[in-house]
């Protein structure tokens, strides 16, 4: 019997989710046995992970701010060019008569 596209889609999603879960296991699940074995090392790893997350967030914020600044500069340049073109057109119309 033929499987419906919906069922095929569900199976693909299931296997895709399982593959991602196996490739990137839950950090909390990995940290629990490590915390029992060596609490100091587990705490240091948690601090390092938090620091890397903070650094990634800061980098993303800086990138967003740079993009916003570039977009603002581009919009200002376009507005200035449009204003200059309108002024030149008005001057030409005045000179014609």
From Swiss-Prot:
<feature type="propeptide" description="Removed by a dipeptidylpeptidase">
    <location>
        <begin position="24"/>
        <end position="48"/>
    </location>
</feature>
<keyword id="KW-0732">Signal</keyword>
<feature type="signal peptide">
    <location>
        <begin position="1"/>
        <end position="23"/>
    </location>
</feature>
<dbReference type="InterPro" id="IPR000104">
    <property type="entry name" value="Antifreeze_1"/>
</dbReference>
<keyword id="KW-0677">Repeat</keyword>
<comment type="function">
    <text>Contributes to protect fish blood from freezing at subzero sea water temperatures. Lowers the blood freezing point. Binds to nascent ice crystals and prevents further growth.</text>
</comment>
<comment type="similarity">
    <text>Belongs to the type-I AFP family.</text>
</comment>
<keyword id="KW-0047">Antifreeze protein</keyword>
<dbReference type="GO" id="GO:0016172">
    <property type="term" value="F:antifreeze activity"/>
</dbReference>
<dbReference type="GO" id="GO:0005576">
    <property type="term" value="C:extracellular region"/>
</dbReference>
<protein>
    <recommendedName>
        <fullName>Ice-structuring protein</fullName>
    </recommendedName>
</protein>
<keyword id="KW-0964">Secreted</keyword>
